[in-house]
Amino acid sequence: MAAQVLPGTPDRIGKYYVVHEVGRGSTGTVYLSHDPFYGRDVAIKLYHATVGDDAESRNARRMFMGEAKMVGKLQHPNIVPIFDAGEEDGRRYVVTEHVHGARTLSAYCRAGSLLPIDQVVSILYKCAKALHYAHSRGVVHRDIKPSNILLTQDGDVRIVDFGIALVADSDVSRLEGVAGSP
């Protein structure tokens, strides 16, 4: 697949061909990418922080991969699945399903673009069910907010970015300081 990329955008991340940047946040950049093996589009979050080779970095790498593996086992219709995770040039990345045409709920948090109350109740219900499912499997999202909830073109809801999830009762997660959005 011949991808047109912006200057400064990587051509590839792991085995995935980068198509274009989708968004940029405080912890990383999300790219629409293509998986050549499965022939499907994916979203890749490439984290800004680089990882060294000292003991703390090795532990952080182990935690990241363990958490990605746990979150990757979540299978719920309202949670965007993780397909893969890895590290390239000292930067970690997570590969998820790309939900074509979806918008984050942030787009509906301003006057003039508010959703009808019955739709808001439905969204909250679906989010609560998805979070309950994750919690029942020992995974806590820790950063649920409008920009981490997608509204699909058909009106369904998908929670994204378990990037700072806490895996409860696990030796791969630890909680130090503050996590999530203010």
Predicted regions mapped to residue ranges:
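Conserved ATP-binding/catalytic core of the eukaryotic-like protein kinase fold
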Residues: 2-182
